[in-house]
Amino acid sequence: MANEVIEKAKDNMKKSIAVFQKELGGIRAGVANASLLDGIKVNYYGVPTPLTQMSSVSIPEARVLMVTPYDKSTLDDIEHAILASDLGITPANDGTVIRIVIPQLTGERRQEIAKQVGKLAEKGKIAVRNVRRDAMDTLKRQEKDGDITEDEQRSLEKQVQKVTDDATKEIDKLADQKSQEITQG
């Protein structure tokens, strides 16, 4: 039962890291990346639909994304959704596909994005710490209820802390990699 607490904490921390990685993937680093468009929803017959379900996204050149809709009648809707996003990119609609040229990042914009990475990393660490707190509370409750001894509780709390430290280091490592990718362009 006590090992379940640690396994659950590990699993939830892995999920927190996965969410952080997905958010990092959506940050523009001056090169074309299909995951940049993952969060965009297109108003498709009144229903907000993920862009990735309505089209294929390819990368014909290093700084160009090409969006090919499955239904050509949705081109304008897709173009408007991309414009309305806060990505700072401008789509070019040629009647059959939408091309998005990813502009070079200015030094100032690179700094803003690096700060955004830092904020996302902090959000990820908070999620990990919340998982840690829940695990610690569960262990305290188990000790209080007599399910585990005080020594077992301390030992398990150390294990939870180690898992937390590892997850935090992983988030820091991912954030550092992304920051370097952005600042070195």
UniProtKB/Swiss-Prot annotation:
GO CC terms of this entry: cytoplasm
Database matches in Gene3D superfamilies: 3.30.1360.40, Ribosome-recycling factor
GO biological process terms held by the UniProt record: translational termination
Cited InterPro entries: Ribosome_recyc_fac (IPR002661), Ribosome_recyc_fac_dom (IPR023584), RRF_sf (IPR036191)
Keywords on record: Cytoplasm, Protein biosynthesis
Positions of region (Disordered): 140-166
Record Pfam families: RRF
Molecular-function GO terms, alphabetical: ribosomal large subunit binding
Main location class: cytoplasm
Annotated family: Belongs to the RRF family.
General function of this protein: Responsible for the release of ribosomes from messenger RNA at the termination of protein biosynthesis. May increase the efficiency of translation by recycling ribosomes from one round of translation to another.
Name used for this protein in its record: Ribosome-recycling factor
